[in-house]
A protein has these predicted regions:
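Active-site residues of response regulator receiver
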Residues: 66
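Acidic, metal-coordinating helix/loop segments flanking the phosphotransfer/catalytic sites
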Residues: 43-62, 82
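Charged docking surfaces used in two-component/phosphorelay signaling
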Residues: 28-36
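Acidic catalytic/metal-coordinating carboxylates
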Residues: 46-49, 70-77
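Conserved acidic carboxylate
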Residues: 21
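Disordered, acidic interdomain junction associated with two-component signaling
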Residues: 1-18, 104
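Alpha4 helix (beta4-alpha4-beta5 surface) of REC/receiver domains from two-component response regulators
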Residues: 75-76, 80-83, 87-115, 120-129
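Residue-level signal for the "D+5" position in two-component response regulator receiver
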Residues: 43, 69-72, 83-84
């Protein structure tokens, strides 16, 4: 299976991911994975920084957001993002404690969730799957 995963196509030209994460170490890890896969990316340390990016003409094929952001949380950001860009795909990242708080109805269509700590392979698979969907 690992060999098959290596054969999956990398990013198409111009595909861009918005990373919204307040932990610089996680942001660096996610951006390194995206760079390795050939995706462009834009980073924001919190939701208030991300909103103007979402409102701009910046191409965004996927938003990866921590659920537990300072101020406005990732789910609230996704709601605003979808008001501006109705087809915005969102991959939430959450810690174990936060994952327990995620109830039914949290994820709308086009939204998925992975739990920290996550593997390079899981992040890679989710990003590819969601952008291709």
């Amino acid at each position: 299976v690992a060999a098959d995963a290596a054969l999956l196509p990398f990013a198409n030209a111009g595909e861009t991911v918005l990373i919204v994460e307040d932990d610089p170490a996680v942001r660096v890890l996610v951006s390194a994975v995206l760079k390795e896969l050939g995706y462009g990316f834009v980073e924001a340390g919190d939701a208030n920084t991300a909103v103007p990016i979402i409102e701009s003409d910046q191409r965004i094929d996927l938003m990866i957001s921590d659920v537990g952001l300072p101020g406005m949380n990732g789910r609230q950001l996704a709601e605003i993002g979808r008001q501006i860009r109705p087809d915005l795909k969102v991959l939430f990242i959450t810690g174990y404690a936060e994952h327990a708080a995620v109830r039914g109805g949290f994820l709308d269509p086009g939204m998925q969730l992975i739990t920290k700590p996550f593997t390079f392979d899981l992040l890679t698979a989710k990003v590819r799957e969601m952008i291709r969907a």
